């Protein structure tokens, strides 16, 4: 089970298995950290700023005022033409026909190795007039498929979720 809660400039992401928290990530105005198997990792400097900048309910809204973003062209993503937008170390792909975000590639470094993580967004469904991808496929060396079972908007979110 994965639970993601967001508010302006705040994000809480928790992954549970058999009722136990496996990993958790918190971002708020003051800090950002990740917990995994009881170990806490605090983010500082550029990592903290990047995480805080992305901690929005709808990250795409921040793109409207981002002077660093650039349209690099149209690319084919899984058979669909998509606008490619370069945003720092990430490239965002939006379907030319639907306007939906269909993929995101991020340049990352882990243990001294540079790699590209690509995430695909599929099966968009309507929730209270907004569209959300119900299928997310992450390629991080292995392919991980996530299926959304429920999206709630403006329900059950408190300040305590972001501490």
Report residues per predicted region:
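Gly/Pro-enriched, hydrophobic low-complexity segments
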Residues: 80-162
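Generic beta-strand structural signal
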Residues: 6, 26-27, 76, 94, ...
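Short, surface-exposed beta-strand-loop junctions and turns on beta-sheet-rich folds
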Residues: 18-21, 40-42, 100-101, 110
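Flexible, processing/modification-adjacent segments and terminal tails
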Residues: 26-89, 109-114, 163
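A generic beta-sheet turn/junction motif
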Residues: 6-8, 17-19, 78, 87-89, ...
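Extracytoplasmic
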Residues: 8-10, 66, 80, 131
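Short, surface-exposed linear segments at secondary-structure transitions and domain or protein termini
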Residues: 9-13, 33, 52-55, 126-129, ...
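N-terminal mature ectodomain segment of secretory-pathway/periplasmic proteins
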Residues: 1-38, 70
């Amino acid at each position: 089970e994965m639970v993601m809660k967001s508010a302006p400039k705040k994000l809480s992401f928790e992954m549970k298995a058999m009722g136990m928290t496996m990993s958790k990530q918190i971002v708020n105005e003051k800090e950002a950290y990740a917990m995994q198997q009881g170990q806490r990792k605090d983010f500082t400097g550029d990592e903290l700023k990047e995480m805080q900048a992305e901690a929005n309910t709808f990250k795409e809204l921040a793109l409207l005022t981002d002077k660093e973003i650039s349209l690099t062209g149209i690319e084919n993503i899984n058979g669909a033409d998509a606008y490619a937008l370069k945003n720092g170390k990430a490239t965002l792909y939006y379907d030319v026909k639907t306007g939906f975000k269909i993929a995101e590639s991020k340049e990352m470094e882990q243990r001294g190795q540079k790699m590209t993580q690509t995430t695909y967004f599929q099966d968009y469904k309507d929730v209270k007039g907004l569209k959300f991808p119900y299928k997310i496929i992450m390629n991080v060396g292995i392919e991980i498929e996530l299926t959304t079972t429920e999206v709630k908007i403006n329900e059950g979110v408190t300040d305590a979720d972001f501490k």
